[in-house]
């Protein structure tokens, strides 16, 4: 039945059906059912009537509001039980605020830990931590252990939220910082809360000792159970205190606080095995009393905050299991230990590499934020002690040894030269701080932000070249044997190329490319970006050697003693070697894909609304803002990669042979690297089987088969193992 009211309905009757409303309300109602059906018959099948006043916004609002499938606030009306808040539950006697048994304490603590982790993984506080009624107002709790624990959890949430907000490396899918008006225990100091937890911890430790078995004494099963339960509660309270103390340590500006956090993390890790083995001692959740599998047990009400959620599609918060909780904490501790290592790094290049490697593990938002705030402390100094400008100068010295930064050079104390280099270094600070911050974002967002930061680095590149030219002119007047050509420019170009390479490679990790696109991505990397990178690294190495020779000559002039020449390890040699290996891997993959295409093993889409050129230009669009290296446009790419320019043009067997040589070359380069790391061994695990597969294909193996090959990216994120099906 479709009804129309002549007066606005009374808001109090929104939950009633139409017949009840008609009886209850004094409103004049008109039955329009027949008129509505007649109007519908005038419409043809599939035709819709669209009123000008009923746009997309109104349509979405009409669908969402008060529809249980769309409005999160309506879920509470669908359960048969009464949803009580903390005060109502206390009056009703459904929740204990004093004399909680050990199993109850253990169970509540474990579920709280699970809720805390679920919040850190991107759900709202209202659907996770604040489903625990004890957290709503710890002042009502009389049990000392429960009160201290509730305050501890609130403080952990508050400091974690502050850290994540300050680091600003989260997006809406990573983290939700809204507190929904709940008090975050701001009236109690951090020191007071850690003191309360320590008192409870000491009390439980005394109970653990008093129930311990003595030699030669027959063990009472009840006393043994009490001992195990006391130990379980003690481990959880101590873990809460240690975790809170670690987060407090990270709020301090001194570097010594990081060392303190490192020691505490070792303690926290030691407690996890005791927590894991005692999970069964806590009271368990009773499932089936609400929708989904949110734990229902004393002290928890999953629907208590449902009305606080905005009228949006209900986001289901699946609380993680207790066994997973222990594993998560174990990984979090390892990540925080890794974060602590950043303060020992000597220069900016090492720090950037560290951030890249840390980000590759896809760490949680809390550990990413802690790394950011440890690197750049509130006073905007690196680790709270070093100026970013000094870090940039050190990075320049270690990479290209520019004469202007050498104390033995005439430009070192030249005011004009000093102003030039200081101005350039100051302009470097913002882009490099942004680059470090980008590595704190999740992997998908990183790629997008890397594309945008190229514009800033392009501007920096332009400035570097101008400063180089000015310094070179000054230097020639005083020291004609020295050059200042392309020193700063080489350094900025190196970072530009790294960003471009990372941007393209991350597309493989995020599974953005279709198989038919692989060939031009690998071509751009091997023929262009890695070629430029190796040339840039070689130029930087040459600048270093030239500066070292001048320094040695100056030393000889002062000292008459003959010094034995030691063979120096070139600082950039390892990176040059790795770039050669990467270039060979990319070249091997490019030739493999071209050969597969020749053999009809690559399925191409039937382009209707786009074309290969449109896709190509979309993939490399961010590079258009960069002047050096100049972007390769689609027609240039087709011309440069055209095999018909060779006489005779190579066929697929020859391309398979060429690809196998590239994989073999990469394998030989990597096998000669001293002290290989995990990255080297991962690439070797791809290069070796691909070399064998290319040899088989070159010999005509499965030549007639048109079944596309499989590309297995499980060993390495950027280079797949080619598998023939």
Swiss-Prot record:
Belongs to the MAK10 family. GO terms for cellular component: cytoplasm; cytosol; NatC complex; nucleoplasm; plasma membrane. Keywords: Cytoplasm, Phosphoprotein. The modification Phosphoserine is found at residue 187. The gene is Naa35. PANTHER family: GLUCOSE REPRESSIBLE PROTEIN MAK10, N-ALPHA-ACETYLTRANSFERASE 35, NATC AUXILIARY SUBUNIT. Component of the N-terminal acetyltransferase C (NatC) complex, which is composed of NAA35, NAA38 and NAA30. It is found in: Cytoplasm. Residues 558-571 have a biased composition (Basic residues). It comes from Mus musculus (Mouse). This is N-alpha-acetyltransferase 35, NatC auxiliary subunit.
